[in-house]
Amino acid sequence: MSLLRTQALKKHFGDTHAVDGVDFTVNQGEFLSLVGTNGAGKTTLVNLISAFLLPDSGSIFIQDRDITYSSVEERIRAGIARSFQLVNLFDDLSVLDNVALSIFAREGKTRRILVPAERDVAVMREAAELLEQFGIGAKAQACARDLAQGERKLLDVAVAYALRPKLLFLDEPTSGVSTRDKAQIMDTVSSVVRGGRITAVVIEHDMDVVFKYSDRVVVMHEGRFLADGPPEDIRRNSDVAKYLLGTDV
């Protein structure tokens, strides 16, 4: 069953057709990877779906509800959340408070994080449990700025996950980390997301990661979809080999 659908979605920047008439469907429960070379349109597509950009034309639906021109806040309430390629944390807050702030925002009680006496015990407990799920529970009281890069990536995903989304976008969750940290991040994220029955769309450049963890892979090229299918089909696709992998099948 489809959770998200775009119809003839377009976004142009001058002569650059960043997203050029894209019809995109994300099915409930998928762990989907969105791949392509730099400038292919991946991040622009996610920015359109998460309301960081408005489309020039086309439509966006979540569970058949038209959200094309709704705000970021309205899309969060509709069940869309995301993490960022450049980690977007409150560095002066503790690791625990970063997650708690996301939970308070979900509950419409953001200001309470600034008043320790008003902090809800249940919220802080939920935040602590989420950190354990993501493997960084031991760092709960540490300042976010003091985390290692891999830990910061996990915290960024945990902050988005704390919103209890139906659809979670992860923008290059393994960029800038070691091979060992990539495996730890993806093992953890895949386990938590699948365990929570969350639908995930991951922008990723490392094709080893893509082929190992994805149910489905969508390849973008010059603002359009070049290929769409299970990992084994994408591996054998001659167009993908030419434009993305730089090889011939």
Where are these regions (language model features)?
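Glycine-rich phosphate-binding loops of nucleotide-dependent enzymes
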Residues: S2-V249
